[in-house]
């Protein structure tokens, strides 16, 4: 199981495959950790948000076509649009939980059930294929690097969130609100906004995971991504 070798210039082995396939889950788990730390709740809609982000990204890249061999629009615009869409999904969840005080499980159940339908509307109910080598790098390999690219995404996400939690005021605020939201509010912290931000961040991280997942399969499949 732990044997690792290099074949065709890339690392090969069961442990590498497990870590590679778990990369999207790590990114999702980091976002859900922030949500749990701040609100004590969960976000069960992250899989659907992944599908929405993948659908938006691939639909822009394909220009509305079912399958393309070259980009019809800028990949930068596509990625930004996908992350904005996922942030909007997170903001919707955050508004329901932080502002309307709906139980997180119930609030996020809305996008859990409706999110894939939204993704299907974006792609017109079809699987959108992006057969471009540069798009495949996010879910494959960059150049001659033997380590799968998703592993780098997961590591970078872990490091950034760790630094935010341990080295910034926002991290302290999230911890304070999570421990005792009422006490945090009484000392001047905007508990509502902090909870809201954690859901937005969770949505963005789900969007990143969705882009990586779509890159793996060169397409946006709203039924299976996430």
Give the label of every model feature segment:
Residues 100, 104-168, 194-197, 216-225:
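Transmembrane helix-bundle core of multi-pass membrane transporters
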Residues 14-25, 74-85, 151, 223-226:
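Structural signature of hydrophobic alpha-helical transmembrane segments
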Residues 2-3, 12-64, 97-102:
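Single transmembrane alpha-helix segments in multi-pass membrane proteins
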Residues 21-32, 52, 155, 159, ...:
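Hydrophobic alpha-helical segments embedded in the membrane of multi-pass proteins
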Residues 30-34, 56-63, 91-95, 117, ...:
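Alpha-helical transmembrane segments of multipass membrane proteins
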Residues 56-59, 83-92, 113, 117-125:
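Mid-bilayer segments of alpha-helical transmembrane spans in multi-pass integral membrane proteins
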Residues 74-78, 88-93, 145-221:
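Helix-loop-helix "hairpin" substructures at the membrane interface of multi-pass membrane proteins
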Residues 66-112:
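Alpha-helical transmembrane segments within multi-pass membrane transporters and channels
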């Amino acid at each position: 199981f732990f044997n690792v070798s290099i074949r065709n210039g890339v690392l090969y082995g069961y442990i590498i495959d497990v870590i590679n396939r778990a990369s999207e889950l790590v990114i999702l788990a980091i976002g859900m950790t922030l949500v749990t730390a701040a609100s004590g709740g969960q976000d069960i809609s992250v899989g659907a948000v992944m599908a929405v982000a993948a659908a938006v990204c691939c639909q822009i890249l394909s220009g509305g076509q079912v399958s393309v061999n070259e980009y019809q629009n800028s990949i930068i615009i596509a990625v930004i649009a996908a992350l904005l869409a996922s942030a909007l999904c997170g903001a919707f969840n955050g508004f329901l939980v932080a502002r309307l005080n709906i139980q997180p499980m119930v609030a996020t159940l809305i996008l859990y059930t409706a999110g894939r339908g939204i993704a299907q509307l974006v792609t017109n109910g079809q699987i959108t294929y992006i057969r471009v080598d540069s798009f495949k790098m996010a879910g494959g390999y960059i150049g001659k690097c033997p380590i799968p690219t998703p592993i780098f995404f997961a590591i970078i996400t872990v490091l950034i969130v760790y630094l935010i939690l341990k080295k910034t005021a926002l991290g302290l605020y999230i911890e304070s609100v999570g421990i005792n939201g009422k006490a945090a509010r009484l000392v001047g912290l905007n508990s509502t906004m902090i909870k809201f931000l954690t859901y937005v961040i969770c949505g963005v991280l789900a969007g990143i995971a969705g882009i990586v997942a779509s890159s793996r399969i060169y397409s946006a499949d709203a039924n299976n991504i996430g």
